[in-house]
Amino acid sequence: MPQLNTSTWTLTISLMIISLFCIYQLKMMNQTLIQITPSTEQSKLTKHTLPWEKKWTKIYLPHSSHQQF
């Protein structure tokens, strides 16, 4: 039964850990976890228009009791 050659495993695992660390650091550079100085643009409240606000909707009154003639 042939033996498994594990001589390159150390190098492979080391490079994998280093590359994962680098990828993680690059991803975290783009994230803002704590905002130190608030920007004025974000402090302004913007009104979001919803699709149903653009349309005219009919508002019905509740049903009245039966009218007797």
From Swiss-Prot:
The modification N6-acetyllysine is found at K55, K58. It comes from the Eukaryota. It is a single-pass membrane protein. GO terms for biological process: proton motive force-driven ATP synthesis. InterPro entries: ATP8_mammal, ATP8_metazoa. GO terms for cellular component: mitochondrial membrane; proton-transporting ATP synthase complex. This is ATP synthase protein 8. The lineage of its organism: Eukaryota, Metazoa, Chordata, Craniata, Vertebrata.
